[in-house]
């Protein structure tokens, strides 16, 4: 009797079959675990389904970090409502994308499809007026801030009304209105100005806010103005202006270029450029109220 025959005679063949079955089952569990782990890793990747924007927070009021294109992929980190937190391309920072722009099959929802400006009351405050002319051009004393803030406000009113908003003006002609009397109720308040310095070198647009509930609107408008307008972007700044201080509503003060700068003055006086800025403001308000 050889060694194999001796071993088989010593051990029950049934036990050998059991060992084989148990071993195969353990191997199956190992393979299943590896497959599930690989699947979990894959599920953390999302694909952008259409051109979109990555933002610093989970709604459209947050500033845009950069644009992404259909087909781009990112690592998913977390979720807030219908917004997905992802790791940026270089892995150095986190950002957010609306879920309906991704492969996660998240619907935007009915609230994203309605007009965000419908039934919204927007207060427009054309700076200065009457005997308060505001800033003036260094080259032409006929170029007065009070005139261009009123032009911009009236043009912006038409654009906002076309978009479904109700608009109030703190002044509708060349009259002086005190700062106290510029306090009107609305869903958002926008004070329109042009900047000026003795030096002709200063240029660009600045968006001011004061209270914490005004910062998101300022960031959103600044982002949209930066995307469309040719004005140098000076960013957003917190400043204790009375028109911002005396309202509890989201409010900003726009300095749309330096009338003391020759290049900015050309853009301030140009209706086409003003319309570009006004469209950016309308887009920003839509974005803000859609969030």
UniProtKB/Swiss-Prot annotation:
Domain SH3b: 41-105
CDD domains: MurNAc-LAA
Entry keyword set: Cell wall biogenesis/degradation, Hydrolase, Secreted, Signal
Region (Disordered): 124-146
Top EC class, one word: hydrolase
Coiled coil stretches, renumbered: none
A single BP term in Gene Ontology: peptidoglycan catabolic process
Pfam families xrefs: Amidase_3, SH3_3
Location within or outside the cell: Secreted
Family as reported in the entry's similarity comment: Belongs to the N-acetylmuramoyl-L-alanine amidase 3 family.
Name of this protein: Probable cell wall amidase LytH
Annotated source species: Staphylococcus haemolyticus (strain JCSC1435)
Gene: lytH
